[in-house]
């Protein structure tokens, strides 16, 4: 059975790999010259299942108003006049209740924990190397109020059986010695000892090499133009003016997925959440982080690779704008100087931005659609790296009609209600503008 995977980020590549392991004949198509050249290229590098939480949370609407007035805010909104932007924000606000937060977080943690297990298994079987560390993630709280507010997350961790530690200032210095000199500015921390780190772009490149050995074909530099469909089936995908056909189709185009789906009558509430990162060469290993630090105040992660520090985070709701905002760089540099002033050389840092495909409830869209041969693997937001292996393996099981190892409840697009409006038979408009 032939499967055509659209998109070669970490999600598309993981989908292709796990499909090939199940015996499918897989082709991956992407406009870029190699895998992981867009959102997967320079993300924060953390694999943190226990910290899998939706942005839509109780209290966020009031916090958002405050953040809009701050210079170093973790969230910024640039109104584009796009109706989809307004609809997405309205849906997000509706998910900012305690009950919705609990449901959404459980779904995210369920998939993230499974994905971490899949990654562990993959690493044990293949020895795949991507500058990985398994030294945990430490969430830093600068105020007592932040520490107290972590109680709701801890309750979900306990319910899900995720190990954790609450740390005082001395405990922070024990697990992250380079923070000993600044521990007095912190109120405490929440540490998840089983979390991991690694270079997502390097991992995706190595996984693609392994997929090639399983027979996967990667076709780069090709423009995915439109889908042809009739009734409840996809007839093919127009790629560079040629109709490519398969038995099954997987859409893993990240933030661009809705553009492809909308003409089919499928309304996928995925919107780009722009993030930024700095990659800083380490100058003093003893003064650099040992694993991943999450700064709760600024929603920024600081992650240790072999000889580099990756600093990533923030969220701009600004459409498909990929310009580099110097104020965001200023914020990232400020946080590094605050916590690790002697760890790396900021003058040699590279600055990057990417569009994370976010859903309003935080949970990705993984599974079947109203079209019998079209499947989605998109909408992972800031957790594409954390959820990649689990999402790819889950999707492969669903396509193979095997019982997945975890419950797929609440993960496919049907959770948003009516999954397809009446669409005119034919094809979509180009997805990549």
Curated annotation (Swiss-Prot):
It comes from the Bacteria. It catalyses: a D-alpha-amino acid + A + H2O = a 2-oxocarboxylate + AH2 + NH4(+). Signal peptide: none annotated. GO terms for molecular function: D-amino-acid dehydrogenase activity. Keywords: FAD, Flavoprotein, Oxidoreductase. Pathway: Amino-acid degradation; D-alanine degradation; NH(3) and pyruvate from D-alanine: step 1/1. SUPFAM superfamilies: FAD-linked reductases, C-terminal domain, FAD/NAD(P)-binding domain. Pfam families: DAO. GO terms for biological process: D-alanine catabolic process. FAD binds at residues 3-17. Its EC number is 1.4.99.-. Belongs to the DadA oxidoreductase family. This is D-amino acid dehydrogenase. It comes from Pseudomonas putida (strain W619). The gene is dadA.
